[in-house]
Amino acid sequence: MTKDMTMGSPLRMILLFSVPVLLGNIFQQFYNMVDTIIVGQYLGEDALAAVGSTGCLMFLVLGFANGIAQGFGVMVSHAFGAKDFKLLKHYVALSLILTAIVSLLLTIPTVAASRQFLILMKTPDNILGLADSYIKVIFAGILLTMSYNVAAGILRGIGDSKTPLYFLILSSFLNIVLDLFLIVVVKLGTAGAAYATIIAQGVSALLCFIYMFRKFDILKTSREDYYLDGYGVFNMLSIGIPMALNYSITAIGTMILQGAVNIFGSSVVAAFTAASKVENLSTQTMPTLGTAIATYCGQNLGAGKYKRIYEGMRKGFFICIFISLAASAICVGGRFIVSWFVSNPSEEIFDYAMQYLNTISFFMLPLAWIFLYRNALQGLNRGLVPMLSGVVEMVCRIIVIAVTLNPFGYWAVRLASPITWLFTGILLIVTYFIWEKQSRKKHSGSSD
């Protein structure tokens, strides 16, 4: 069912919307973790390092695609909040057209150049072939991955955060079965893990679209809704492209970090891969809050209810404190989780993984700020600064690694993300409060 976030308690609306999104994010991480666990346990340390070494490259490309998809969802939330259902149907149709175009434009060059990208990232020779086998399949399935994110974004834009969860849970179990079959039985190696992932996401996307068009009359499109118009395309891409570029720019900085990790050899790569999985697991509440706040701000902006936006953001700030404390606790206690990903891990792997996790545990609050304020600004049609914040992230990582890698070694890896989060979080907080101050002045006479 739809959820109108322009009425009722802001805190209650945000939390109720967030719970299914959080469960969905956890399940998405879950089947990503299953890939990693099965690869590590059945294919060994080199295969685990190979899959892990592709993470930043995947984030660069899939982050761009999914950033555009999220932008489509924001525009849907604006139309839904304004109760303009004719425009809403056109945005749904336009989302499907643009998804097909963007997927095609991304798939061809990335599949062709995947090996060259991995070489540029200094991927160790002993895992290069395994990494390329994995990433080529992932890139070939961009359409399936992006389609699920578009369908989920549309449903969340009208306040339905439960339906994407149900189909994602189903596809998660499918992913586990396919992982075991393709890796253990068919013996496709790292490529088998990639096939399992994209097939599972494709099933989830298909079921989402079928349900969406059958269940919600306001989303049922007709032939007259499918056309490319300059105004509609501009509106969709003016939000989607900054969100996409933000993901990709951030990913470039992360790729530089991965390149620094790769210098230390496959054991450190495996340790960093496992530690990154713990980090991702511990921070799942943060993108969840970001998704909820983007929809909340988008609907209330469309409805012209600015006071609700201010109130919701205050509640979001306090939520950040609680979720950052929980994330820190998981990181500090992450040694047990690290053991899930590597068969018979050496003490060296544990040591490198925990060094990283203990360091980042002190900086979880700035990371939570990034998700809260970046998504709020995107939901408010202020996409430029969130995109520039990605540039700040990239530059910070480059500077930290360039200055500290030679004299301090692995400390460069440990410090790059925390320092980046601190500077980026402050930038986004300042930008949001400038917008709020201007908005309060502009709408001071409004009851909303």
Locate predicted features.
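Short alpha-helical transmembrane segments in multi-pass integral membrane proteins
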Residues: 1-18, 76-141, 185-241, 297-363, ...
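Hydrophobic/aromatic residues in alpha-helical transmembrane segments
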Residues: 19, 35, 72, 113-114, ...
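Transmembrane helix-bundle signature of multi-pass secondary active exporters and lipid flippases
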Residues: 21-74, 138-145, 234-299, 320-327, ...
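Helix-loop interface residues and adjacent transmembrane-helix termini in multi-pass membrane transporters
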Residues: 33, 42-45, 79-82, 157-158, ...
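Small-residue-rich hydrophobic transmembrane alpha-helices
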Residues: 48-108, 145-164, 271-335, 367-389
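Hydrophobic transmembrane alpha-helices of multi-pass small-molecule transporters
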Residues: 60, 175-180, 205-209, 281-284, ...
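Short runs within selected transmembrane alpha-helices of multi-pass transporters and secretion channels
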Residues: 69, 137-156, 164-172, 193-206, ...
